Amino acid sequence: QDMRTALLDLYRELDAYQDARPALDAVYKAGLPAAVLSNGNQQMLNHAFAAAGLTDRLDSLLSVEDVGVFKPDPRVYQLGCDRYQVRAEEILFVSSNGWDAAAAGLFGFKTIWENRAGMPVERLPSHPDFIAPSLDFISEHLSTGSASTRS
């Protein structure tokens, strides 16, 4: 139990990648809402994003706790539509997990797979709309209005 608690405490204190803040700043400056949609619980999300200093750029921290199932269940992705009262195709979903981007794409979101490690595209029933090596892609895309890394 002590090891589990120690690991969870470390997870709550993870530093954000250096490109996270500039990407969220770009979204904010563009007048767009930004949210996190996570399999984590609400308490963990609140603590982790406060510790990373990013909550001032996030409109919502959405947890699967609200629906009682985990991604890739479509009810989880529906949380984003319900929160912002938009259609799925109006949401741009960014994930560092290929399976998560694939499931979000099947749900109807436009997707970016943030693939820092340069992993090969997995054989999944859907592929991301964009593949980017970092979150800098978001800042660049919002400032130029074009995408340079098409999948």
What are these regions (language model features)?
Residues D25, L37, N41-Q42, N46-S151:
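Asp-based, Mg2+/Mn2+-dependent phosphohydrolase catalytic module
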Residues D2-V36, N46, P74:
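Short, acidic loop-to-helix structural element flanking the phosphoryl-transfer center
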